[in-house]
């Protein structure tokens, strides 16, 4: 799998679309290079930087999304509000805000860091591996959603009880419970104990 220094600039000499590069990191989250997105997710996977966003409405309900059916990785499954990968050199906070707007057509009214979590989750359905150093963010959303259908097949605001029910019947991303559990202390601080998270 190709690895380049994190400061390298991708180039395309044949006029085709440039490869999407991800930041490879060590176990402490320190950038050690880049790799093409698909190759970083092929078994056994390469540890790379990612982010996960959890946005809540004024009633303390979590916004979840169903990933578009056209995605090559985990299509059609439900997951957290937004997740993705910063561009090499891009701050995870900036990437989280950018991708939330690109996918859902809305900017959070509040977005705060909620820690990091490291995991390795094979996805049997796609044969790919999520080996990520994931930056977590929690926040509030108040504007009307305008999801991009190329990215998002559906959205729902759910209470903890509704999420438990959905999780029992619908397919969720391999990483969903790991990132939600890691973000729970910040979620509780944001939503208050009465919300039940």
From Swiss-Prot:
E.C. number(s) listed in UniProt: 5.3.3.2
Protein name: Isopentenyl-diphosphate Delta-isomerase
Compartment(s) where it occurs, according to its Swiss-Prot or TrEMBL record: Cytoplasm
An annotated Gene Ontology molecular function: metal ion binding
UniProt cofactor(s): Mg(2+); Mn(2+)
Record: residues binding Mg(2+): 83, 103
Gene Ontology biological-process entries: dimethylallyl diphosphate biosynthetic process; isopentenyl diphosphate biosynthetic process
């Amino acid at each position: 799998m190709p690895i380049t220094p994190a400061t390298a600039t991708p180039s395309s000499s044949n006029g085709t679309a440039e490869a999407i590069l991800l930041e490879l990191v060590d176990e402490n989250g320190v950038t050690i290079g880049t790799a093409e997105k698909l190759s970083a997710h092929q078994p056994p996977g390469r540890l790379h930087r990612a982010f996960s966003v959890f946005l809540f409405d004024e009633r303390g309900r979590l916004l979840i999304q169903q990933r578009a059916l056209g995605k090559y990785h985990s299509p059609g499954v439900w997951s957290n509000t937004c997740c993705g990968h910063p561009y090499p050199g891009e701050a995870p906070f900036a990437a989280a805000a950018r991708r939330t707007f690109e996918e859902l057509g809305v900017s959070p009214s509040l977005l705060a860091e909620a820690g990091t979590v490291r995991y390795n989750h094979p996805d049997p359905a796609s044969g790919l591996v999520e080996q990520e150093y994931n930056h977590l963010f929690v926040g509030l959303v108040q504007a009307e959603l305008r999801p991009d259908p190329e990215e998002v097949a559906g959205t729902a605001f759910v209470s903890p009880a509704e999420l438990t029910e959905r999780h029992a019947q619908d397919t969720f991303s391999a990483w969903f419970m790991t990132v939600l559990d890691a973000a729970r202390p910040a979620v509780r601080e944001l939503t208050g104990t009465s919300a039940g998270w």
